[in-house]
Amino acid sequence: MTTPQYRQVPAQVDLPALEHAVLDFWREQKIFAKSLEQSEGRPEWVFYEGPPTANGMPGAHHIEARVFKDVFPRFRTMRGYHVGRKAGWDCHGLPVELAVEKELGFSGKQDIEAYGIAEFNAKCRESVTRHTDAFEELTTRMGYWADLQDPYRTMDPEYIESVWWSLKEIFNKGLLVQDHRVAPWCPRCGTGLSDHELAQGYETVVDPSVYVRFPLTSGPLAGEAALVVWTTTPWTLVSNTAVAAHPDVTYVVATDGEEKLVVAEPLLAKALGEGWETTGQSFTGAEMERWTYQRPFELVEFPEPAHYVVNADYVTTEDGTGLVHQSPAFGEDDLKVCRAYGLPVVNPVRPDGTFEEDVPLVGGVFFKKADEKLTEDLETRGLLFKHIPYEHSYPHCWRCHTALLYYAQPSWYIRTTAIKDRLLQENEKTNWFPDAVKHGRYGDWLNNNIDWALSRNRYWGTPLPIWRCAEDHLTVVGSRAELTELSGTDQSSLDPHRPFIDDVTFTCAQEGCSLEAVRVPEVIDAWYDSGSMPFAQWGYPYKNKELFESRYPAQFISEAIDQTRGWFYTLMAVGTLVFDKSSYENVVCLGHILAEDGRKMSKHLGNILQPIPLMDQHGADAVRWFMAAGGSPWAARRVGHGTIQEVVRKTLLTYWNTVAFQALYARTTGWAPSEADPAPADRPVLDRWLLSELHALTDQVTQALDAYDTQRAGKLLSAFVDDLSNWYVRRSRRRFWQGDKAALRTLHEVVETVTKLMAPLTPFITERVWQDLVVPVTPGAPESVHLSSWPEADLTAIDPELSKQMVLVRRLVELGRATRAESGVKTRQPLSRALIAVAGFDTLSPELHSQITEELNVASLASLSEVGGSLVDTTAKANFRALGKRFGKRVQDVAKAVAAADAAALSLALREGTASVEVDGETVTLAPDEVIITETPREGWSVASDSGATVALDLELTEELRRAGLARDAIRLIQEARKNSGLDVADRIALRWTATDPATIAALTDHSGLISDEVLATDFAQGEADDSYGAPFTDEGLSLVFRLRKQ
């Protein structure tokens, strides 16, 4: 029976090529399907996929969210859960319509209706599936496991029926209403927008800021003074209806000697500037109520009396003049105030944003372009007090970037304000990552919640399922089956989109009414579609009832931070409206992806990174690791080739090199795991330390991923892989050469566990390692790492004391290396001894001592106390920065005490922990960071100290030490020659050498056994080589020439 063996692992790895091979393996072996089948019956861990719209090509930012949406389902699957991963597509909405309009060369709704709604919607349907292949390619290439074969689509009839059902539920609760309100309106798209859409489209603009005189025509100041009103929207002055004043604010009359103006007292200087003084007259806003004034423009007719001062509590004295122009057709607060006074609502602006043609001066002009003409007219008539350009943030359409106007119109609203308290309660139950979003960005959003403007005057969307008769009786339909019953005709195959749904009528369902009911013309906000996906993806409640109920709410969702006002909000709002419970429990908010130069990625700047080429250059694992662990996931991050290459170099290649090292020496020595391998307790201290660190790592990484902290998990893994390679493997290299079973078994166990821990983050490289190092030598091993179980940390196997001691060992090694470098004595040159002074040195075992002596290449270690203070001259002085925080003004007194103290005694005390000095009769305790100790080595010694630790190297070289150093130089040269000759690490060699320097001859002669062992020479002799040996290698420094051949 042959011994099982690792597969051969190449020293160099091509990550993209490796990943394509792994993709083939997953596909051929149906690994994703097996992971779902294997976990059937386990507890559900529910994840919701936020649906993208596939009417455009995917970008680098699509990778980011997909990384997190893959990491945690993989992690939870390995932890023993069943994690369904249904993919989805967002199909409806204004972005889709605008893209199709652009393709067809349309300029607005009139072109769509001339073309035909059915034909236009057919184009939209085709558009949203145009790039699904590209999205699926991205999803597959990056290793994001999702069910792409059975996705939900928001345009499918069953999905729409579920949405209808939910709207009927909301209507029956009295929360879906039609109202005439001022709401954001896009004149280009001809539709209203919801508050969360509005939040996504602010742009910085410069508008005219005008201060306008409104001459008073009644009250005590009639004919002699004017109100001064400030606005940044001069175009709304055409329909000015009133001026609002706060009832409790004092308004003063000011004069410059020529005219009198009325402004709020706190804003006198700010609004009017220098040269204005009060006349002594003042009035409260309440006293000014119903004073009439001359309106700024008489371009439109008013059906009822208007144009007087009204009182409003929302008026402030922070900006402007304290007097606010009211135009109720274009302002929500204005509408409320004017309604309370019974004032008319006059709207001279058409839905396309242009003034009615019969409006003098600005007829047919787009509202924003009317500002200039109107301002000039005010100035000509002497009503313009001053005009200042004003830079501010103004709402624009989040898709077409047209300036919005607030527009009074009838729309359908969901009364989310009625469930505000429930939303806040659900938010309290939700875990946000980062936590600051909970009561910050998202909490503020909920606290300022306004009713959801649901309806859209558009075409490609879920039709609002409300039918109305001429008597305004409303019937809300929840399914096509219900529509069949109401209409008396079979609607089971009906496409529920416009215009087909518009053709369905029925007799009003209101008892006693026989009028025809016709569907209202609007469609709904596409954000409601995506917010309904938890139940609509299953066609609930008409099918999959138990399935949905077992998968609501989600344990986890993740998208970019801007979704706090998008999908995160609509998911919570719809869930709470319909089920009185939020749709999710944990949400990870991701920062935006920027170009390497810190700017936003855009075609215009030419700094877009295409996702597939990016992964084919660096590897998907490298991109995934960067996204998950290359910085705070919730902060904006710069992505570029350089940053990703650093990830590959620092972590992934180090991991791979360690795996290749293990495979090489296990195959070379014929080792495979067996029961004959030493038990952990019987292995050397370095093995025991590594296994202790491994269990600690497992515990810490598990905790980090449980807390959705991929950055911390990545840092832990990266640091461990670095320690594994640059400390454990390097320190144990000779043991691996010798086929040491304890070392090989230890590294095997560590690689297997680390591979599992890294698998959710880097699924490709870990799969390859699993196939190469685990499956071949482990009977019954799962065929994929992604079918394996998450490792369990054995907390009893963690040795905190050993960990602490190894930290000390490595600290002393670093100090020793530093002082060697400073002395100029190379590491290959053996030294006789190192003296150590540090707290805890006496607790180190002989095994740990040997780690230090071998690393520092010294023959022995001893405590510095054995030779007293003769090695260094010691000085001590105060660290003012550290002491100043504690002692403030007394720091000078403490500094003098430190300077007067015995510096050597202070140094010794600080190594043990703390030191003390007398200051004005008081004993003051000092910490190591509060005193700067300087130790100057005496001749023949090299000394380094840091934070209470000192390493002193004896630099005196005997002839024996010099010869040993030369022997090590020769070993290095021969190892390089072996490598350059193309020999395998296990190949034995014969070597012939000659030298002219007596020191070199003596060194190679005295240390021939050591050299032979190190370079695997079975025949090592001085003398000329025959022609069977290779070309000569020469080193002038050693005056050495040698030739070698494979045995």
Curated annotation (Swiss-Prot):
Catalyses which reaction(s): tRNA(Ile) + L-isoleucine + ATP = L-isoleucyl-tRNA(Ile) + AMP + diphosphate
Co-factor(s): Zn(2+)
Class of enzymatic activity (EC top level): ligase
A molecular function (GO) term: ATP binding
Location of the motif 'KMSKS' region: 600-604
GO biological process, one term: isoleucyl-tRNA aminoacylation
InterPro entries noted in UniProt: aa-tRNA-synth_Ia, Anticodon_Ile_ABEc, Ile-tRNA-ligase, Ile-tRNA-ligase_type2, M/V/L/I-tRNA-synth_anticd-bd, Rossmann-like_a/b/a_fold, tRNAsynth_Ia_anticodon-bd, Val/Leu/Ile-tRNA-synth_edit
GO cellular component: cytoplasm
Position of the signal peptide: none
A Pfam cross-reference name: tRNA-synt_1
Family: Belongs to the class-I aminoacyl-tRNA synthetase family. IleS type 2 subfamily.
Functional summary from the UniProt entry: Catalyzes the attachment of isoleucine to tRNA(Ile). As IleRS can inadvertently accommodate and process structurally similar amino acids such as valine, to avoid such errors it has two additional distinct tRNA(Ile)-dependent editing activities. One activity is designated as 'pretransfer' editing and involves the hydrolysis of activated Val-AMP. The other activity is designated 'posttransfer' editing and involves deacylation of mischarged Val-tRNA(Ile).
Protein's name in the database: Isoleucine--tRNA ligase
Organism field: Streptomyces coelicolor (strain ATCC BAA-471 / A3(2) / M145)
Classification of source organism: Bacteria, Bacillati, Actinomycetota, Actinomycetes, Kitasatosporales
